[in-house]
């Protein structure tokens, strides 16, 4: 029951998972400047625990100012196209396989634990052979499937990510550290390069264009872990608190809009139009319809407080002042 609400393309999804806050246009603009302080950010927190931190992106590092805001989050070692990443950057989209193979030696022999962040790109639209190098590369693997060309093209791009992950797992296993590695995998948004009809070709059930189009998955993997399915609803703002809990990192839960998915807190998903889903009901802000066993006004008040908190923490650089005190 993990949802990835669409907020202003990739950067909105990335913002949620890296900060534990709700995005909007003004906060994303401020965040991209790289001027905010994030003493409780992902890389900063793990560095304080003795980890080396790395970040990689298989596209231009200047795009969306990614090199600035990842630095603000504590990533000292960042590579991307035009920023030291040695892959073929003269194609679109670039290859996640090439990114993984070009970077694992940076950290896999580290004398310290490492925390590595990858922003993949091979699954990006458009989903046609003519405009997408990854679709063209993997087309023979999907061409005979009983789907539309757009749906097959989408699958072709995901094969690239799948094989990139295979390469990473093999490298970790060959080094003898796979069992001591945790992998967290999530999306930044639904594939908006496909129509709802094309998405439903690939879905095991019929999705609607408001709630279920955003239904996705969060995978937290360790080779020695027992499989567990978490049924409570969640979204990317919950990922950071969940990771901190799993690594026994102490944090003040009041400093994030999200919450630990493994806690007893009720799950909540908030869409960009303020529709929402909880473990006990859902609300459609477009028509005002509510269904479930919980006070909708109570949930709406919680949502407003979380949104205001998120906006203020970025707009006024709130974490900087909290840390100083």
Language-model segments: which ranges?
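Solvent-exposed soluble domains appended to multi-pass membrane proteins
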Residues: 1-325
């Amino acid at each position: 029951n993990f949802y990835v609400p669409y907020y202003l393309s990739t950067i909105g999804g990335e913002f949620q998972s890296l900060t534990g806050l709700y995005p909007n246009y003004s906060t994303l603009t401020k965040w991209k400047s790289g001027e905010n302080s994030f003493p409780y950010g992902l890389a900063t927190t793990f560095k304080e625990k003795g980890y080396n931190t790395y970040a990689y992106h298989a596209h231009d590092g200047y795009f969306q100012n990614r090199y600035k805001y990842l630095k603000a989050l504590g990533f000292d070692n960042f590579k991307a196209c035009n920023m030291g990443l040695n892959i073929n950057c003269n194609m679109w989209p670039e290859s996640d396989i090439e990114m993984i193979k070009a970077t694992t030696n940076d950290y896999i022999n580290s004398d310290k634990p490492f925390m590595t962040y990858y922003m993949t790109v091979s699954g990006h639209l458009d989903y046609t052979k003519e405009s997408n190098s990854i679709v063209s590369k993997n087309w023979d693997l999907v061409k005979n499937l009983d789907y539309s060309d757009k749906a097959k093209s989408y699958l072709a791009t995901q094969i690239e990510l799948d094989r990139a992950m295979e390469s990473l797992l093999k490298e970790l296993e060959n080094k003898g550290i796979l069992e001591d590695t945790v992998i967290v995998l999530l999306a930044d948004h639904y594939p908006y390069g496909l129509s709802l009809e094309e998405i439903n070709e690939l879905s095991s059930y019929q999705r609607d264009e408001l709630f279920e189009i955003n239904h996705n998955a969060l995978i937290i993997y360790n080779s020695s872990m027992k499989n567990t399915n978490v049924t409570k609803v969640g979204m990317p703002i919950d990922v950071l608190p969940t990771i901190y809990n799993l690594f026994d990192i102490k944090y003040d839960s009041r400093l994030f809009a999200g919450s630990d998915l493994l806690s007893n807190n009720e799950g909540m998903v908030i869409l960009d139009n303020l529709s929402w889903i909880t473990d006990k009901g859902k609300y459609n802000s477009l028509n005002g319809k509510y269904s479930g066993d919980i006070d909708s006004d109570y949930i709406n008040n919680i949502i407003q407080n979380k949104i205001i908190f998120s906006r203020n923490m970025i707009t006024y650089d709130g974490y900087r002042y909290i840390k100083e005190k």
